[in-house]
């Protein structure tokens, strides 16, 4: 099925500047780089079962932005049984570029903004590929039933995604269609 829109799921990490970087990067993609072609996942609405948010993830490829080794975004996707189409891993962006997240969580400082721009570039690259490549094929999937332990995931859940590195900081689960790899 041809891809018309991409869902972006930024990490919502508590007390981590990188989570602010992830959220700002997702807004940069949504508003500036690919306006009208992306949607932002709202985790609280998703967890409450808001139909619009559930359908967004089921009917569109999702790019997860994980901001730290806990990989909360990937973990949630693994638990609901829908692998993300792509994953951007902020620690890899940091090590690749030398950019740092900065210190301010509420409003990013200049160095944090630069990192957010670079993360947004990675997200947009993956999203643009899925939107434009005529051979990229996305199959709709159904969310597994929610349970009380939804947020109690382990590394095993993330390991099940079996990520393949496409290029520095950009990954996809082995089970998902190739990007440009």
Where are these regions (language model features)?
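Iron-sulfur (Fe-S) cluster-binding modules
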Residues: 1-39, 50-61, 73-181
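Acidic beta-strand-to-loop metal/phosphate-binding motif
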Residues: 61-67
């Amino acid at each position: 099925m041809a891809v018309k829109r991409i869902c972006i799921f930024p990490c919502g990490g508590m007390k981590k500047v990188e989570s602010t970087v992830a959220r700002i990067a997702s807004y940069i993609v949504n508003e500036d780089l690919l306006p009208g072609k992306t949607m932002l996942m709202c985790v609280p609405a998703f967890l409450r079962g808001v139909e619009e948010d559930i359908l967004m993830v089921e009917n569109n490829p999702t790019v997860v932005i994980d901001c730290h080794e806990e990989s909360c975004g990937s973990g949630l996707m693994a638990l609901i049984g829908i692998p993300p189409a792509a994953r951007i891993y902020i620690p890899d962006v940091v090590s690749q570029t030398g950019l740092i997240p900065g210190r301010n969580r509420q409003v990013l400082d200049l160095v944090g903004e630069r990192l957010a721009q670079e993360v947004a570039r990675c997200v947009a690259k993956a999203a643009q590929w899925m939107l434009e490549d005529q051979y990229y094929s996305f199959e709709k999937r159904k969310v597994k039933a929610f349970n009380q332990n939804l947020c109690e995931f382990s590394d095993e859940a993330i390991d099940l995604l079996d990520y393949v590195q496409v290029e520095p900081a950009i990954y996809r689960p082995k089970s998902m269609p190739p990007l440009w790899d």
